[in-house]
Amino acid sequence: MLVVLLTAALLALSSAQNTDEEVSNAEISDVKQQPDSDSDLPSDDVNPGNVQDHESAPAANEEPSVSPGNEQEEQQQQPLPVENQEPSDKERHRKQKRPPPETLHHRENLRPQIYRQFGIRPFGSLFPEPYRFQPWA
């Protein structure tokens, strides 16, 4: 029951973050498209009330509807990697591969040594050892 509630809360949180990102992307695209929309106005003697309505209307219209055109615009807004530009630290970290281990089971090889230090048989009953009599114990 608790797992279901936590999963539902996590999904709600992630969807809220996604909608916030979409709204911010829509606002950014409105700001970038604003000079083009000013050229579409019929005349320069527009009163300030009409300009405010013109700016607020696209933000309200773009939030509920998502069309393929908007996705293409968002993809075009993303910066394209420049050939001469150095990759960022995250990209370098992604591209780096771990060096191959010295042996195939390099971590497993350490376990029997640790087990023997504490008197634990690593393989259980596969390799039974005779009980050693210790007269001082």
From Swiss-Prot:
Leader sequence residues: 1-18
Subcellular compartments: Secreted
GO CC annotation: extracellular region
Region (Disordered): 14-113
Biased composition (Basic and acidic residues): 99-110
Residue stretches of biased makeup (Low complexity): 75-85
Listed Pfam families: Pro-rich
Function: Unknown, male-specific function.
Protein name, per record: SMR2 protein
Organism: Rattus norvegicus
Gene that encodes the chain: Smr2
